[in-house]
Amino acid sequence: MSLINKEILPFTANAYDPQKDEFFEVSDENLKGSWSVVCFYPADFSFVCPTELEDLQGQYDKLQELGVNVYSVSTDTHFVHKAWHDHSDAISKIQYTMIGDPSQTITRNFDVLDEELGLAQRGTFIVDPDGVVQAAEVNADGIGRDASTLVHKIKAAQYVRQHPGEVCPAKWEEGSETLQPGLDLVGKI
């Protein structure tokens, strides 16, 4: 089932804030009012996951400049996130919120729960300030994601939101031409 153009479902969970080195409660309301990235991954203390989360951290400053809040989510607890942050060279660099979802509520809400394993799949979602999913990417377990493409998608989503009636073509870059769908373009692209 696609979540595109659907509002995120309610949730409440415990999270770890690496910048403040503290635990706090987070909910779907935290994702509203600004752009958000929600990055699901299978498990802490694993193999591909730390490479993806470190790569996401490498784009964190760019995402912050775009006004984007970043959340990583796995079915581990917030306590395990803290332990992983304290012991992994890659994860110790992370500055964004790490949400624990041991109840699998959020993972189910975003339709990325591997029911057989009880773990999240590799899913990334861009959520607009209204709490509506604008983009989604879900990969097989052995395929890591590239956070630089995420920045590109967010810029396009933000542009389209700010410019109703325009769409961003393939390989669109900030400042390049967009399209205005209409009869005059039919068959001319």
Swiss-Prot record:
Q: Where in the cell is it found?
A: Cytoplasm
Q: Which UniProt keywords apply?
A: Antioxidant, Cytoplasm, Disulfide bond, Oxidoreductase, Peroxidase, Redox-active center
Q: Check the record and name the InterPro entries matching this protein.
A: AhpC, AhpC/TSA, Peroxiredoxin, Peroxiredoxin_AhpC-typ, Peroxiredoxin_C, Thioredoxin-like_sf, Thioredoxin_domain
A Pfam family of the record is 1-cysPrx_C
Catalytic EC class: oxidoreductase
EC number(s) in its UniProt entry? 1.11.1.26
Q: Which PROSITE patterns match?
A: THIOREDOXIN_2
* Source organism superkingdom: Bacteria
CDD domains in the cross-refs: PRX_Typ2cys
Does this UniProt record's set of keywords contain Cytoplasm? yes
> Its GO CC terms?
cytosol
Alphabetical GO biological process terms: cell redox homeostasis; cellular response to stress; hydrogen peroxide catabolic process; response to oxidative stress
- Gene3D superfamilies according to UniProt: Glutaredoxin
Q: Which reaction does it catalyse?
A: a hydroperoxide + NADH + H(+) = an alcohol + NAD(+) + H2O
Question: Can you tell me which residues form the catalytic site?
Answer: 49
Give GO terms: molecular function aspect only: NADH-dependent peroxiredoxin activity; thioredoxin peroxidase activity
Subunit field text:
Homodimer; disulfide-linked, upon oxidation. 5 homodimers assemble to form a ring-like decamer.
PANTHER family, per the entry: ALKYL HYDROPEROXIDE REDUCTASE C, THIOREDOXIN PEROXIDASE
User: What job does the chain carry out?
Assistant: Thiol-specific peroxidase that catalyzes the reduction of hydrogen peroxide and organic hydroperoxides to water and alcohols, respectively. Plays a role in cell protection against oxidative stress by detoxifying peroxides.
UniProt similarity note: Belongs to the peroxiredoxin family. AhpC/Prx1 subfamily.
What else does the entry mention about this protein?
A: The active site is a conserved redox-active cysteine residue, the peroxidatic cysteine (C(P)), which makes the nucleophilic attack on the peroxide substrate. The peroxide oxidizes the C(P)-SH to cysteine sulfenic acid (C(P)-SOH), which then reacts with another cysteine residue, the resolving cysteine (C(R)), to form a disulfide bridge. The disulfide is subsequently reduced by an appropriate electron donor to complete the catalytic cycle. In this typical 2-Cys peroxiredoxin, C(R) is provided by the other dimeric subunit to form an intersubunit disulfide.
What is the protein's given name? Alkyl hydroperoxide reductase C
